[in-house]
């Protein structure tokens, strides 16, 4: 670590305290031109400390002088002559400062960046300047990490809202299958919009799905919705075909349908969804089943006299954009139409209009499961007749 001082500078040690600069210059001037003679003196007493530095203009002269003069006696004392080296205190003064200067910026950078500095400085109660920095930077880092900590929870919370948003409709539907129906819809990609879209497409969607194999009685239910069977049934699957979404309402009697068809719960949930959206108008148009004359105007036709029956295998899904819960319900609706509450005398004349139209209002048959609807007896029978005459 000992560094040579500038070339041509010699260290002369072991001098007599009486020897001065002039004596040194006279002694070493024989080897070459001397640039500087520096006799080290005590600051307080101003007396020689016994060593000096002589700088030659030419490094070669310095080397010759060191070679010749080393160990010779000057003023009665043997002197030591060698290439001058940087003093230890000087090198230490210069050396350590760079690390210190480097270290301090590092410390400040740490405090600025991650707040590591602030943690250290309080523990040791560092200098004021460091403390000031830590005070300044402490706020920033302390704030920064907290947002980082807070950040992830929002992310975690975010997805649940997404899940919950779909659940909103399911919950409002009030079906026993809320979660399951929701999952079912999510799985098939049926969301809110399909509920409203169905009205126009109702005419042909039946053919498409029917051809695709959805018309099978259990096509939808058995295929996608087996899980829901265990749920509290809503008025069974006879809903769409014969009673026209009687399952659409939750108030529809749940009793006696689950045993006949495990799909009640499913229908109930989907019935609600559909009734709320695309099928409300059709149901209302048939609301007369409850008490008004059915002449309120036949609801939109779905493709002709028997088409509705043909597609009774379709759940309102067919109407509501392909929702899947009613296929089985329609497939089995015949049983209900024939076996359950036969109200009134089947009358073929009206069955056609009923077939053409959307199912009755949700209210009319939501209660029809329990009692014959007011003013709807004959109409119900006709509906049943229409169902009986269907291809199924």
From Swiss-Prot:
GO cellular component, one term: ribonucleoprotein complex
Biased composition annotated in UniProt, kind: Basic and acidic residues: 67-78, 194-229, 238-283, 381-392
GO BP term, pick one: mRNA splicing, via spliceosome
Keyword Membrane: no
Domain (RRM) ranges: 8-86
Pfam families referenced in this protein's UniProt entry, alphabetically: RBM1CTR, RRM_1
SMART domains, A to Z: RRM (SM00360), RRM_1 (SM00361)
Protein name as annotated: RNA-binding motif protein, X-linked-like-2
Species: Homo sapiens
Source lineage: Eukaryota, Metazoa, Chordata, Craniata, Vertebrata
């Amino acid at each position: 670590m000992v560094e040579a001082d500038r070339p041509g500078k010699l260290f002369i040690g072991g001098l007599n305290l009486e020897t001065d600069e002039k004596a040194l210059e006279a002694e070493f001037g024989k080897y070459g031109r001397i640039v500087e003679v520096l006799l080290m003196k005590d600051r307080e007493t101003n007396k020689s400390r016994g060593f000096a530095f002589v700088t030659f203009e030419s490094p070669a002269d310095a080397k010759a002088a060191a070679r010749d003069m080393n160990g010779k006696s000057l003023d009665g004392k043997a002197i030591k002559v060698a290439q001058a080296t940087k003093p230890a205190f000087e090198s230490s003064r210069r050396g350590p400062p760079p690390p210190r200067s480097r270290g301090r910026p590092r410390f400040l950078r740490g405090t600025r960046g991650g707040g590591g500095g602030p943690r250290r400085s309080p523990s040791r109660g560092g200098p004021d300047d460091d403390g000031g920095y830590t005070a300044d930077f402490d706020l920033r880092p302390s704030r920064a990490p907290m947002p980082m900590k807070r950040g992830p929870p929002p992310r975690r919370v975010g997805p649940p809202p997404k899940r919950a948003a779909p659940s909103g409709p399911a919950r409002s539907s009030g079906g026993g299958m809320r979660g399951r129906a929701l999952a079912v819809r999510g799985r098939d990609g049926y969301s809110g919009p399909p509920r409203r879209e169905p009205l126009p497409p109702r005419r042909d969607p039946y053919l498409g799905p029917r051809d695709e194999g959805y018309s099978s009685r259990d096509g939808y239910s058995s295929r996608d919705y087996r899980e829901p069977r265990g749920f509290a049934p809503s008025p069974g699957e006879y809903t769409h075909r014969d009673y026209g979404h009687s399952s659409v309402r939750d108030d529809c009697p749940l009793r006696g349908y689950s045993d006949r068809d495990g799909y009640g719960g499913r229908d109930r949930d989907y019935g609600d969804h559909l009734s709320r959206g695309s099928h409300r108008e059709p149901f209302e148009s048939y609301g007369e089943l409850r008490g008004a004359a059915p002449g309120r105007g036949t609801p939109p036709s779905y493709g002709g006299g028997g088409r509705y029956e043909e597609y009774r295998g379709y759940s309102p899904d067919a109407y509501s954009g392909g929702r899947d819960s009613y296929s089985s319900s329609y497939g089995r609706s015949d049983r209900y139409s024939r076996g359950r509450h036969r109200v009134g005398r089947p009358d073929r004349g009206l069955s056609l209009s009923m077939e053409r139209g959307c199912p009755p209002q949700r209210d009319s048959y939501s209660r029809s499961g329990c009692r014959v609807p007011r003013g709807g007896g004959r109409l119900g029978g006709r509906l049943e007749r229409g169902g009986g005459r269907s291809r199924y």
